[in-house]
Amino acid sequence: MGQKVNPHGFRLGITTDFKSRWYADKLYKDYVKEDVAIRRMMTSGMERAGISKVEIERTRDRVRVDIHTARPGIVIGRRGAEADRIRGDLEKLTGKQVQLNILEVKNPETDAQLVAQAVAEQLSSRVSFRRAMRKSMQSAMKAGAKGIKIQCGGRLGGAEMSRSEFYREGRVPLHTLRANVDYGFFEAKTTFGRIGVKVWIYKGDVKNIAEVRAENAAARAGNRPARGGADRPARGGRGGERGGRGRKPQQAPAAEAPKAEAPAAAPAESTGTEA
């Protein structure tokens, strides 16, 4: 099962998160159609920008688009001209106010989508598919990946009959749900037809899945501080100063005061009887 299914969908809610975050009832199909159009717009005209993924959040009158790219300078443009153009196109498409965020991918050598695009660009430039695959695998392993698998399918080398070949280095546990496996796909357009490139990159196991979910929730909430943080003073024991059981220790000294005076009165009574 793990060999066939998309690794992102297989681990959704465990180690990966939704790329589109919104809720709709009657407008569901319209929003899905808009999301497809937005992602198609981002990838069609900016192949050189190295866009890894596009995340979309929606409210009633606002759309937030996060673009993860390896070359943010190309997306921003000179003095932000390209970013303004993209924002204007998105507002025309959605009819709502668009908040555009451009985020840089820190390590593009271990991003599966960017690796697939790099291999596809080399195939379009008539580079040998074996050489392109091995070069990308070496770069990913040097960058810190624990395992990588690259598969190319199509008329490889201009052959009459299409076939698929893959190379693997390290471990790529596709059945392990706690494994952080990144997946990317891209098509190379060559003179012999299209060649599909699939990339799986294993980055290690996720030790605490609850922490990953908490980080994803914090990122969606805009990094808001959680309730009961370090700046909040801690409440006392049970009840505290609100009354009830918390005030019983304060009444104990008043109840013990008569017992302390009792020994002082006893000698006076004994002297009186002796006289």
Curated annotation (Swiss-Prot):
Residues 216-228, 249-268 have a biased composition (Low complexity). One of its GO terms (cellular component) is cytosolic small ribosomal subunit. It comes from the Bacteria. Disulfide bonds: none annotated. Residues 216-275 are annotated as: Disordered. PROSITE patterns: KH_TYPE_2 (PS50823), RIBOSOMAL_S3 (PS00548). One of its GO terms (molecular function) is mRNA binding. One of its GO terms (biological process) is translation. Residues 229-244 have a biased composition (Basic and acidic residues). Residues 38-106 form the KH type-2 domain. Gene3D superfamilies: 3.30.300.20, Ribosomal protein S3, C-terminal domain (3.30.1140.32). SUPFAM superfamilies: Prokaryotic type KH domain (KH-domain type II), Ribosomal protein S3 C-terminal domain. Keywords: Ribonucleoprotein, Ribosomal protein, RNA-binding, rRNA-binding. Binds the lower part of the 30S subunit head. Binds mRNA in the 70S ribosome, positioning it for translation. Part of the 30S ribosomal subunit. Forms a tight complex with proteins S10 and S14. Belongs to the universal ribosomal protein uS3 family. This is Small ribosomal subunit protein uS3. It comes from Streptomyces avermitilis (strain ATCC 31267 / DSM 46492 / JCM 5070 / NBRC 14893 / NCIMB 12804 / NRRL 8165 / MA-4680).
